[in-house]
Amino acid sequence: QIKLIAKDLPKVKTWIQIEDGKAELVDFAHSYNDIITKSSAMPRIERNENNTLMIYTGGTTGMPKGVMYTHGSFVVSIFGGLKAQGHKVPDVRDRENIEQLRPIIIEMSRTNSLSRCLIACPLMHGTGMFLGGFMTHNLGGAIITVPKVGLDPLLLLNQVKSSKATSMVIVGDAFAKPILEELDNAKSKNNPHDI
């Protein structure tokens, strides 16, 4: 299908194809696997933990504003997620301890206990981006999304079961109440969700 539209996209200078074993490499594309194989790792860039990320939010007032977070505070909160799951986590505010996290994540992988997080809220929302995406990925886990725009509690609960999600990220009552209503409705019909 890319061949059909490529001529209509003259500003695209480089095409990279990720092989999925089903289609041959398009003649004008580069193989992603070849690029990765031929590339070498970039040197590690040390970042200052006080570097700031700003996201925009309406918050509780509905008025847009910027909220600033430091990278260091994110590292602490991300690994706090491991502690909440019952793992013994070193104090990561001491940079020397961060390397101690690697064996924890390797053990989680070995025991098939890495997080599988269903992100129910938008990824553009701080909760979806940070708690759902960044935290899960930084701990070696997988994120799960649904292929439909909008909040559909039945779809979410079915996705939890079919994708074997271990957690779901939501934002407040706007998500919790409809999901709880669906759980209650299913239970009242003697057909509770098996999650």
Locate predicted features.
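Adenylate-forming
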Residues: 1-5, 20-23, 121, 165-195
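A short helix->loop->beta-strand "cap" motif at the edges of active sites that frequently abuts
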Residues: 9-15, 141, 192-195
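Short aromatic/basic micro-patch
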Residues: 29-30, 68, 169
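Conserved pre-ATP/AMP-binding loop-to-beta segment of ANL
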Residues: 38-56, 63, 89, 107-117
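Short beta->alpha linker loops
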Residues: 49, 73, 151, 171-174
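Conserved AMP-binding/adenylation subdomain of ANL enzymes
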Residues: 77-119, 124-169, 181-182, 186
